[in-house]
């Protein structure tokens, strides 16, 4: 595991070039930089759900003309992170109960299959060690920076498992869901402890993969995702201000 630009990066699997190579993490064009910055600001809560955003202000913020901002907005609408309302502007997408259910159903289908296939294909001791290091990262709810690092490590762990499948489509499917998942976790983590329990669950998943036990890998990933879903949906009911109905 290494860190670059403040982010955890899993260096095994796709990212090492052993199987498939992940998309370049460094945006190459101004349009990509605007998209990456805009997306990060939504995911990390700089822009709040439902907030109205001015194209002019966004162009100033990202040091670009309005054209790259428009291009980024179209992509973010496809990512379900932004709404474009004709003649009104841009609005940060709400995190609705429907979004929560959709993302967890998607993760259950895709990531359980990913863990199962990873156990079938196996991993080197170095990769297992690296994923184990990612699984050890935890945070306290009063440490915002630590929580962000925990969520980055969580993303790297799940992408690392997906990379072990040596299946580009599975990897991309897991990757596509992570922006929504990071956003959900950041919205929930302020009022719920996300530290030790996910660590134990991650280590259980990893142990099943190390033991080449696909059935157990599938089940432990399923249990992990369901535990996360129960926590977040519980928060959505108790503290509805964090999530919108719909």
For the regions a language model picked out, list residue spans one by one.
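Short linear motifs at protein or domain termini
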Residues: 1-120, 233-246
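C-terminal regulatory/effector modules of DNA-binding transcriptional regulators
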Residues: 2-4, 191-246
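Conserved amphipathic alpha-helical segments that form helical-bundle/coiled-coil interaction surfaces
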Residues: 103, 107, 120-187, 199-208, ...
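Short helix-capping and inter-helix turn/linker motifs at the boundaries of alpha-helical repeat units
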Residues: 29, 129, 193-196
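Mobile beta-alpha loop/short-helix "lid" or hinge segments that flank ligand
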Residues: 78, 82-83, 177-179, 194-196
């Amino acid at each position: 595991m290494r860190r670059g630009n403040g982010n955890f990066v899993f260096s095994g699997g796709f990212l090492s070039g052993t199987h498939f190579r992940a998309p370049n993490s460094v945006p190459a064009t101004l349009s990509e930089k605007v998209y990456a910055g805009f997306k990060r600001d939504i995911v990390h809560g700089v822009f709040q759900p439902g907030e109205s955003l001015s194209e002019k202000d966004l162009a100033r913020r990202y040091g670009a003309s309005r054209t790259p901002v428009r291009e980024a907005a179209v992509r973010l609408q496809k990512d379900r992170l932004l709404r474009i309302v004709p003649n009104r502007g841009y609005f940060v997408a709400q995190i609705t109960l429907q979004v929560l259910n959709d993302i967890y159903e998607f993760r259950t289908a895709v990531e359980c299959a990913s863990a199962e296939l990873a156990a079938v294909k196996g991993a080197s001791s170095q990769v297992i060690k690296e994923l184990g290091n990612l699984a050890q990262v935890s945070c306290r709810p009063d440490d915002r920076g630590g929580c962000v690092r925990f969520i980055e490590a969580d993303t790297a762990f799940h992408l690392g498992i997906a990379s072990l499948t040596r299946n580009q489509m599975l990897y991309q499917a897991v990757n596509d869901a992570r922006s929504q998942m990071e956003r959900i976790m950041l919205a929930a983590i302020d009022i719920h402890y996300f530290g030790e329990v996910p660590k134990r669950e991650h280590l259980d998943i990893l142990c099943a993969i190390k033991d080449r036990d696909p059935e157990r890998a599938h089940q432990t990933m399923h249990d992990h995702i369901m535990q996360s879903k129960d926590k977040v949906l519980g928060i959505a009911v108790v503290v509805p201000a964090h999530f919108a109905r719909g």
